[in-house]
Amino acid sequence: MDRRLLDYDLSISQKMDQQFGFHTIAAKMTDVPGHTIGMVPALAQAGIEYLHLGVNASSRVPDVPPMFLWKCGSEEIVVQYAGDYGEVSALSNGTVLEFYHAHDNAAPPTPQELDDLFETLAARYPNAHIEAGTLEDFALKVREIKHTLPVITEEIGDTWIHGVATDPWKVSCFRRLLQLKEAWIASGQLLVASPSYDVFMENLLLVAEHTWGMDVKKYLLDFTNWNKKSFIAARANDHTDETFYDACNQALLTGMSEELHHYHGEHITSSYSKFETSHQEQRNYILRAVEALPEELQEQAKKEFAFSWPSVPECAPSFHANEPIPVGSFIVTLGAHGELLQVKNNVSGEIKDLSLGLIEYETFGGKEVDACYYDYGRDLKDNYYWSEPDFGKPGLHYHKEIRHNIYTPTPVSVRTDNNTLYVFLQFPQEASEAYGCPREFAIVYFFENHAICMQIFWKNKDAIRSPEAIWVNINPQVIEPTCWKLNKLNTYISPDHVCYDGNRKLHCVQKLLYHTNQKNIVITSLDAPLVSPGAKTLYTTDNTFEDLNNGFFFLLYNNRWGTNFKQWYEEDMRFDFTIQY
């Protein structure tokens, strides 16, 4: 989300405070392993003093103190981390916080359960006064000892953030609406103090929420059909049940049995189409946001969402890679895979050496997935039956034909028209037939004196169930790569200033900034916010920082996540990038 949407989110609790005579100074985030430090200014300015982060029981916990002062510039909040949804917290002033959580999507405790809880706590703390309270009550006690807390200035990030790229269309529309919103507000076309604005923003908030569909292990149920051919047949058959857990995953089925019967009743059955309806339900938040707008703005939004395959004039001249190509007032050179390697301005004589637009298609097998699962996860012995379907791909390792591969394209047509360069690409046939690589890609480059604009299109992509990723590399080849900064919520963050066991590999950004006394470069990715600094690192979860001399790898699509996310993608797509000098 952007800063205005986050501020709107925080304003909801402020309005409720006014309505109910409450004063919110505490916040709680449960399940997701972390957030960006870019949130700190917004939270602090909204009056939030204390943030509790309760991490999913099998996810890696960032290596930060249990309680600390998170400082971003002049703004700060107290953050408390727990290795589960909530743990016991004892302050030096004699205050103890005990959480009593229900399970996900479960009802609140019964009166009897609360009576039992108070009895248990009375035995545990025989000399204490025990009362039900709010996080605000605890935050006031934290305020008393705030000055004793360690200070953290590092980014933490979110080690689940790869899920952002599971539905490129939805995220593209979301990002374009955020950009349009700013233009509409500036022009007076969209009034902040209007009912339509509230409905618009509320639906955008629902897109940003971390659950994006039905649970794979409860509603798709299929951990058998990883092979492309069998997946296509199973999807067409459109029936799943507990037998799709397969013989090799019976331990998972046993662990999940109680929950499965709770959700399905006696007969555990589902279907691919039922699972897919939940992803359309999530996309509908985009449609509802648009429907809330005045008619004129609705039309603008629909035009912004629309795109078509690039059309080149018949008279446009043809060229090849590795030769000088005149494009308007520029001379450019392409590499063997269609990437832009050099741009010379014929008027100023300035030459830019870079690597822009190298697209790569990556597939993964059970070896890579299992290694990531065991490296990233914790307490797996206790939580294996739900954590492996969430973070792994159960049964994939039995399919030896599904392997790790990195495919690169070949230019099949290079054409020019005025200041525009068209590059049409194809990947090796295996990437599309055995896996899910789009059969056709096009890159359109627009050249200006101080900017290069790049559009990437793909079409004819097959859906597959096995893990895949589509990357594009942008590398302006700067002299001092440590000067790059990530823009998150209007806060600039160094890619190498991320805490141990935070997300050092993937970031969701609004833009990238390179700033020195000699040069400024801004990279803006309108549609694809997920970026891996220095290397392609979807299934790499170690704590090394990658080499920024290699540039940035934008992750256009992946299906690593299990749980509540789309598991395949087959639609045509378009992505816009701008590199400003």
For the regions a language model picked out, list residue spans one by one.
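Catalytic-domain carbohydrate-binding cleft regions of carbohydrate-active enzymes
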Residues: 1-267, 274, 417-581
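Catalytic and substrate-binding regions of extracellular carbohydrate-active enzymes
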Residues: 198, 206-209, 216-460, 569-573
